[in-house]
């Protein structure tokens, strides 16, 4: 059996396992939090000119809450590909083209460094003026104080609050590196002419659809206490081993043995743990610690630009 057959077997095995690592009954996003926020968004849409849907550029389809999108798509929508520095450009471009076909605008941002923020402000103003004022050019019109209102939505831990703080130039929204930081809606001013409403992060109803739950867990959207981090790390290893470029970066990062293709995901995780000194008494590998090291390295881009879709 050659290495390509082994990779195909690994891929099929993960498909069969589906999302056993996600105890969906423990993820209590419904009905209260989600249903209430959806009602509030629906109520507030009449005040809104533009909707910014913040996506994780590594999982631009899995990070879209379809229920929210169906609710807001009657408005002008900008798909914001955040964390674009962590994703491979060809995959981003492919996803952008799909959303453009659906009538959405797209832009890439990095809410940590501020890359793309000025372009996003410019796009909000350009679209906002077109939506609210059409082609008016009179002198009296030019003197009107223009205000454009945008609603920001997205899944937990996608960088919404950091993005808003970069837009506003101050710490207006609560920020953290774990899901569920923003608890309420709030209006935030951006300069003199843009007002942004932040909303709590909203997970999709069905985390098992197309294995999206596993991808969301890998990027850190789902709280670690409700998932099996070792099984999620196994899923990440399976993805890394299914692509020659990803595999080469993975091996280089942890100085792994060249012939690890023949090993199972748990055995590969043990190698990662041993290389990183995640050891218990008796020279046993602390596989939970190894899983956390691997997941954190992926989330912070230390393995490389790896897309999960």
Give the residues covered by each predicted segment.
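Alpha-helical scaffold segments in soluble metabolic enzymes
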Residues: 119, 123, 162, 235, ...
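Long, charged, alpha-helical interaction scaffolds
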Residues: 53, 100, 115-116, 128-129, ...
């Amino acid at each position: 059996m050659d290495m390509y057959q082994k990779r195909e077997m690994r891929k099929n095995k993960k498909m069969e396992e589906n999302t056993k690592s996600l105890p969906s009954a423990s993820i209590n996003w419904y009905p209260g939090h989600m249903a209430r926020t959806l009602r509030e968004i629906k109520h507030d849409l009449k005040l809104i000119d533009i909707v910014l849907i913040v996506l994780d550029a590594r999982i631009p389809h899995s990070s879209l809450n379809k229920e929210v999108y169906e609710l807001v798509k009657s408005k002008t929508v900008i798909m914001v590909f955040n964390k674009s520095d962590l994703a491979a450009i060809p995959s981003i471009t492919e996803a952008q083209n799909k959303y453009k076909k659906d009538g959405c605008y797209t832009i890439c941002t990095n809410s940590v460094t501020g890359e793309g923020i000025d372009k996003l402000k410019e796009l909000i103003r350009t679209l906002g003026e077109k939506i609210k004022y059409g082609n008016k050019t009179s002198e009296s019109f030019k003197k009107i104080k223009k205000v454009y209102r945008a609603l920001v939505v997205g899944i937990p831990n996608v960088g919404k609050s950091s993005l808003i703080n970069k837009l506003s130039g101050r710490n207006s929204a609560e920020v953290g590196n774990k899901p569920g930081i923003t608890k309420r809606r709030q209006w935030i001013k951006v300069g003199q002419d843009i007002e942004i409403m932040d909303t709590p992060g909203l997970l999709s109803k069905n985390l098992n659809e197309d294995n999206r739950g596993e991808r969301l867990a890998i990027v850190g959207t789902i709280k670690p206490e409700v998932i099996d981090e070792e099984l999620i790390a196994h899923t990440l290893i399976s993805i890394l081993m299914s692509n020659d470029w990803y595999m080469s970066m993975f091996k280089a990062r942890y100085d792994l043995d060249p012939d690890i293709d023949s090993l199972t995901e748990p055995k590969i995780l043990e190698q990662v743990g041993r290389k990183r000194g995640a050891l218990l008494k008796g020279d046993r590998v602390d596989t939970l610690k190894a899983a956390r090291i691997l997941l954190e390295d992926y989330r912070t881009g230390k393995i490389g630009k790896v897309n999960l879709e």
